[in-house]
Amino acid sequence: MSLRIIFMGTPDFSVPTLRALVEAGHEIVAVYTQPPRPGGRRGLDLQKSPVHQVAELLGLPVLTPVNFKAEEDRQQFRDFNADVAVVVAYGLLLPEAILSGTRLGCYNGHASLLPRWRGAAPIQRAIMAGDAETGMMVMKMEKGLDTGPVALTAKVAIDENMTAGELHDSLMLAGARLMRQAMAKLEADDLPLVTQAEEGVLYAAKIDKGETRIDFSRPAQDVHNHIRGLSPFPGAWLEMDIGGKPERVKVLASELASGMGEAGSALDDALTIACGSDAVRLTRLQKAGGKPMSAADFVRGTPVPATTRLG
């Protein structure tokens, strides 16, 4: 026995779940993903999403509607006669006609311990807030934003120096395992659903470019969380004088350090920077248009002597 599944996802994060469902023997009757976007060096080439590319390799039918406003798109979805839709980082809000368009509904893989961090950026927000753990949850979708009842949970610890990129990869694999388990239970009519708690609701707003600059007047722990929560994308940044002019430099990794001084000033020549309290050591950086490099390589080409002001 197997389920007839419509899979809906777009980025790399979604791919292991799609593969896991195929490997489990389910029938993927359609794959929905975001339409190809301009890309390439000049932005002239249309690039298919990671899910689109993998689905084609697997010989699965792919659909790329811009939205589901047209009745013909909604009817096409229903006409697949799917048992269930599995949604992982699809990127479109689903109307009621889609949520109710399969026999058993839509199940979403969400990267947080709901109701904490509902919304668009749960991985980044968990790290930026200094959370010690997060996880993947499979929930049955309803009209509200990530408000549906939870079926299964897999917790993942957040190490003190873990970046959003590293956590993304851990959750990506945990989510694939969890969704495979959830679909097996759903097929066996043994998938429990638990209503989310009303307490502890937090929303993970999309990262705004205006909040990515590093503010060294904050405590060192906050600065460290900010850096790792935005690494590798979009990247926390600071401004420093390079060749007599101010330039942006992304900071991709850091660690807590001891030391005191004026916030934003270098305490040594190894990129230990004073914060509002204590200090952070910048360990991986990237100049505009350049490749990421270690702090040692960075200061070898761009010395940052003690007392240098950064920000």
Swiss-Prot record:
Keywords: Protein biosynthesis, Transferase
GO molecular function: methionyl-tRNA formyltransferase activity
GO CC list: cytosol
EC number: 2.1.2.9
Protein family per UniProt: Belongs to the Fmt family.
Keyword Transcription: no
InterPro entries the UniProt entry points to: Fmt, Formyl_trans_C, Formyl_transf_N, Formyl_transf_N_sf, Formyl_transferase-like_C_sf, GART_AS, Met-tRNA-FMT_C, Met-tRNA-FMT_N
NCBIfam families: fmt
Function: Attaches a formyl group to the free amino group of methionyl-tRNA(fMet). The formyl group appears to play a dual role in the initiator identity of N-formylmethionyl-tRNA by promoting its recognition by IF2 and preventing the misappropriation of this tRNA by the elongation apparatus.
UniProt entry tagged with the keyword Secreted: no
HAMAP family: Formyl_trans
Gene3D superfamilies: 3.40.50.12230
Positions of (6S)-5,6,7,8-tetrahydrofolate binding: 112-115
Catalytic activity line of the entry: L-methionyl-tRNA(fMet) + (6R)-10-formyltetrahydrofolate = N-formyl-L-methionyl-tRNA(fMet) + (6S)-5,6,7,8-tetrahydrofolate + H(+)
PROSITE patterns, sorted: GART
Name listed for the protein in its UniProt record: Methionyl-tRNA formyltransferase
Source organism: Agrobacterium fabrum (strain C58 / ATCC 33970)
Coiled coil: none
EC category: transferase
